[in-house]
A protein has these predicted regions:
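Glycine/acidic-rich beta-strand-loop module
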Residues: 102-140
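Non-catalytic RNA-recognition surface used by pseudouridine synthases
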Residues: 133-190, 206
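RNA substrate-recognition surfaces in RNA-acting enzymes
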Residues: 36-52, 167-253
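Flexible glycine-/small-residue-rich
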Residues: 61, 74-76, 128-131, 153-155, ...
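A short, contiguous, amphipathic alpha-helix enriched in charged residues
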Residues: 84-103, 162-169
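S4-like RNA-binding module at protein N-termini
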Residues: 1-87
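Loop/turn elements at beta-strand to alpha-helix junctions within RNA-recognition modules
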Residues: 15-16, 120, 196-200
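Short, charged/polar surface micro-motifs in flexible loops or helix N-caps
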Residues: 77-80, 89, 98-101, 121, ...
Length: 253
């Protein structure tokens, strides 16, 4: 269903700055809206727009989509931190366009936030959103959202390692054994491991408890959604409506 918004309010909601800055963008002819006959420059700040999810518009020559809430997928490269205040490595948020980082929030931090964290040297699938409920559902252990990791170890592994991880290993901060939801060797030094919780450095610590050092770690899947191989490290894209429905269904099942 379409929602009617003033153009300045639309731009503000999508993270293009204060309403004063948004009004300036309009007045300078830097905003183009789809009028049904293609994108047309709009200069009147009091213009009302009927907005729908995914509606295209252009700001300063860059094409955007309107989304009430932002749900994006980032292919996290190595050497980046999942933090707004990184300690030693560039932030993953620096890979996102400014509007995604500036989307206004009624409470908490503005802009999209990572759904869980990946270590600086871990690559792969990272979801981000400004929907707090979505973030909670996807990251809370009680929802058991499976996450698949592909890893390589320094030394060769044997079938006994798989058995240990499936039966459960004890980490140094928790007497309760931690189990893999699924685990399979994919080579003498490689493995696919599925977890449904996200403890600190969990994959590396589980493998260490089983006697192996992880030298490469990549998250390839969250729920039923597999990382798109056409999305290069450092690139991002919007989640489709179908992908979002599939992810949220997983947390409700």
């Amino acid at each position: 269903m379409a929602q009617r918004l003033l153009l300045t309010d639309l731009l503000y909601s999508q993270g293009f700055g204060t309403r004063r800055i948004c009004a300036g963008l309009v007045q300078q002819g830097l905003v183009q809206m789809d009028t049904g006959h293609g994108l047309v420059c709009v200069r009147e700040t009091d213009t009302a727009v009927d907005v729908v999810q995914g509606m295209p518009f252009m700001v300063q020559g860059i094409l955007w989509q309107y989304h009430t809430k932002a749900y994006v997928l980032l292919h996290k490269p190595a050497g980046t931190e999942c933090s707004h205040k990184p300690s030693a490595w560039p932030s993953v948020y620096s890979l996102l366009p400014t509007p995604l980082r500036q989307r206004p929030a009624k409470t908490g931090l503005q802009g999209v936030q990572a759904v869980g964290r990946l270590d600086q040297d871990t690559t792969g699938m990272l979801l981000l959103s400004d929907d707090g409920q979505f973030i909670h559902r996807m990251s809370s252990p009680k929802h058991h959202v499976p996450k698949v990791y592909e890893l390589e170890t320094q030394d060769a592994m044997h079938a006994s390692v798989v058995e240990k991880l499936l039966q459960g290993v004890v980490l140094n901060d928790d007497p309760q054994p931690v189990k893999a939801a699924a685990c399979a060797l994919t080579g003498s030094h490689s493995m696919a491991l599925t977890l449904t919780e996200g403890k600190y450095h969990q994959v590396k610590r589980m493998l260490a408890a089983a006697g192996h050092k992880v030298v490469r770690l990549h998250r390839s899947q969250v729920g039923d959604m597999v990382l798109d191989h056409t999305l290069a490290p450092g690139q991002w894209r919007w989640l489709s409506g179908e992908e979002l429905k599939a992810l949220t269904r997983k947390t409700q099942s």
